[in-house]
């Protein structure tokens, strides 16, 4: 009887212990000089798919740090289609106009379920008109992490595009020819996925530091020609505006912040996406310089405008879950107080602490806002999905002051409505609406209204804004829907706050 067998006899609770075999019995790759370092490398995406064990019915995930420049999602799904896979759940952190190619793979049954923060373009139009049998699950950035945490969403294989990686899988978005900046979305997928496949443009020597995605999270690595075009990050919702009306609204929003009571040394802010929201930053600069007020941190999607304020000493730290332009990506690489954070750290309501809980002020956009301050950023005036939840309801719930910026009308279509088509963020989370026709304050915040009126700002009742909009456009014709549900709007805690129904075809 050997030593291990004696242990089994004398200590029954140790019966699972095994006798020593060889130094490399559990790590055979260490006995192979080539496999020791290159065992994760795959010659093609197809090889990585096979090694990762993708099967019909599984869930695959992607990140959208490259936004409209992404080349990974379409490439991988097209390959999976050619390989014959069916009934897959697509769990991308978001989908863009560039993902219209997915339509054919939904029609053919390759993709049968989708979890995403949002969608745009022909893909969104097709789904809004009933393309899928299963409704799309629309979640917030923080809410996505909670779905993963709670086990409703389980990623089998994550395909994550990165500019550079070493042969063990240490990767970041701040080096290489196609820098996208923060990999805050991908960090979550790398943590939760059963298998992680990196698609990288460049293989660099070990160790590739700093690493956003680390070697103990990564299973396989494929070098590809391109994962994305960083020049297309700052288009669409992340574009920079020169529109006079949007700039005027941005200036009004900066005035609201200045006189809100929260504009004081050490305040914190997030400026969100949307042209007027991001433009607000440039107007905050002059107010901060004039008053000597410096911010403790800015959070969320980071823009070049926020980087300018940081480098001028007006914002102490930048907490970055997504870079909205090349200037922000470059800053993340060189500025030690420009810090990358995951969407879990950013806004997960189920985490032990979400950074958004520390926010004083947030500026957000809206497709519609109703007289009860409920906000829609998902569906357009035609009922078609054309936006994203993003971090909207996350930061609106957490910030001390939530400001929505929007024009009163868009192409003669009212933004202020009686009731939003789709409710994403509840009115109880919205404090102020800033439009080109005046500023409305939620009645639940009388102290804010009083401060703004004392400052001489144009304060109006939100019902008056609605009446003004209707007087200019008339009452819009109601959108006709069928009974089929094509989208489920999940609040950040996972609950259902609304649904999207199929748009009825015109006869």
What do the predicted segments below correspond to?
Residues 1-507:
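Conserved alpha/beta enzyme-core scaffold
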């Amino acid at each position: 009887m050997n030593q291990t067998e004696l242990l089994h006899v004398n200590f029954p609770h140790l019966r699972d212990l095994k006798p020593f075999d060889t130094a490399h019995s559990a790590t055979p790759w260490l006995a192979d000089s080539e496999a020791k370092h290159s065992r994760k490398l795959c010659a093609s995406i197809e090889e990585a798919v096979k090694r990762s064990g993708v099967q019909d019915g599984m869930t695959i995930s992607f990140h959208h740090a490259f936004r409209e420049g992404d080349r990974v999602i379409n490439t991988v799904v097209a390959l999976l289609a050619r390989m014959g896979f069916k009934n897959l759940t697509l769990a991308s952190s978001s989908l863009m106009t560039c993902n219209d190619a997915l339509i054919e793979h939904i029609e053919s049954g390759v993709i049968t379920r989708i979890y995403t923060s949002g969608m745009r373009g022909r893909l969104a139009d097709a789904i809004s008109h009933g393309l899928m049998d299963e409704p799309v699950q629309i979640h917030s950035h923080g809410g996505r992490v909670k779905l993963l945490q709670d086990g409703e969403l389980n990623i089998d294989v994550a395909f994550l595009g990165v500019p550079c990686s070493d042969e063990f899988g240490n990767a970041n978005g701040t080096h290489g020819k196609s820098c996208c900046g923060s990999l805050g979305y991908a960090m979550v997928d790398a943590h939760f996925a059963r298998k992680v496949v990196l698609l990288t443009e460049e293989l660099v020597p070990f160790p590739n530091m700093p690493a956003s995605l680390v070697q103990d999270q990564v299973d396989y690595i494929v070098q590809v020609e391109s994962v994305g075009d960083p020049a297309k990050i700052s288009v669409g919702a992340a574009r920079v505006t020169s529109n006079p009306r949007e700039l005027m609204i941005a200036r009004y929003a900066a005035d609201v912040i200045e006189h809100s009571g929260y504009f004081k040394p050490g305040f914190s802010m997030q400026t969100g996406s949307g042209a007027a929201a991001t433009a607000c930053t440039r107007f905050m600069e002059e107010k901060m310089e004039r008053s000597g007020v410096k911010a403790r941190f800015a959070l969320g999607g980071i823009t070049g405008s926020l980087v300018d304020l940081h480098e001028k000493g007006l914002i102490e730290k930048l907490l970055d879950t997504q870079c909205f332009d090349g200037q922000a990506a470059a800053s993340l690489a060189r500025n030690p107080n420009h810090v990358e954070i995951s969407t879990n750290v950013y806004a997960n309501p189920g985490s032990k602490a979400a950074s958004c809980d520390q926010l004083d002020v947030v500026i957000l956009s809206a497709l519609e806002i109703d007289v009860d301050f409920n906000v829609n950023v998902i569906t357009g005036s035609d009922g078609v999905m054309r936006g994203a939840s993003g971090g909207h309801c996350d930061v609106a719930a957490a910030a001390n002051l939530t400001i929505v910026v929007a024009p009163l009308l868009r192409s003669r279509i009212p933004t202020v409505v009686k009731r939003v088509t789709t409710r994403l963020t509840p009115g109880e989370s919205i404090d102020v609406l800033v439009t080109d026709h005046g500023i409305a304050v939620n009645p639940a915040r009388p102290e804010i209204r009083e401060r703004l009126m004392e400052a001489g700002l144009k304060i109006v009742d939100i019902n008056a804004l609605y009446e003004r909009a209707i007087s200019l456009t008339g009452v819009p014709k109601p959108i006709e829907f069928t009974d089929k549900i094509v989208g489920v709007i999940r609040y950040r805690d996972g609950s259902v706050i609304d649904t999207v129904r199929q748009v009825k075809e015109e006869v």
